[in-house]
């Protein structure tokens, strides 16, 4: 199995074979300039080189995500069910009141984005941020992927590898699940 670095090197070689692919880079930038990937009234910066992960790394991300979700769900369940446990958290009483309101859906944590640093040498991870309030990053990822998906280097790479994006899970899949909650 190629390493993530080897996949990236292969992709960069495809770009180099096309003399840097100025036309593809300009098309990607034009896509971004007309996209919905905007943060603080500015189009987000993006790289023309996608972040490529092999199967091992994808499986590691899956394990980290599922384990983290399980732990967070257990903590949230304990918080909701055990009043003595709540003192561990210094939360404004008004917010506690809102937290304890009935949800109207089963999931304790219907949405989260967990940011981490992954050491690709040993697959260890360090968390740097937890978010459960929304994520413009899902839309940014979708737009950035769309900006390069029709480029010649990307098409050549995809022809040689099984390429899978996470757009369905990150954006459309989330929208579908969100609508099911309130259907």
What are these regions (language model features)?
Residues 1-183:
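Preference for protein termini
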């Amino acid at each position: 199995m190629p390493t993530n670095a080897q996949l990236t090197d292969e992709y960069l070689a495809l770009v180099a074979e096309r003399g840097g692919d100025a036309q593809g880079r300009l098309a990607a930038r034009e896509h971004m300039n007309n996209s919905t990937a905007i943060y603080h009234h500015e189009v987000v910066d993006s790289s023309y080189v996608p972040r490529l992960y092999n199967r091992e790394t994808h499986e590691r991300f899956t394990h980290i995500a599922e384990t983290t979700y399980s732990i967070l769900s257990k903590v949230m369940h304990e918080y909701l069910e055990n009043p003595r446990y709540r003192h561990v958290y210094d939360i404004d009483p008004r917010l506690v009141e809102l937290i304890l309101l009935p949800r109207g859906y089963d999931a304790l944590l219907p949405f989260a984005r967990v940011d981490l640093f992954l050491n690709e040498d040993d697959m260890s991870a360090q968390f740097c941020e937890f978010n459960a309030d929304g994520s413009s990053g899902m839309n940014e990822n979708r737009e950035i992927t769309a900006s390069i998906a029709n480029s010649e280097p990307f098409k050549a790479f995809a022809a040689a590898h099984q390429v899978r994006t996470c757009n369905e899970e990150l954006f459309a899949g989330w929208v579908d699940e969100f609508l099911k909650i309130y259907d």
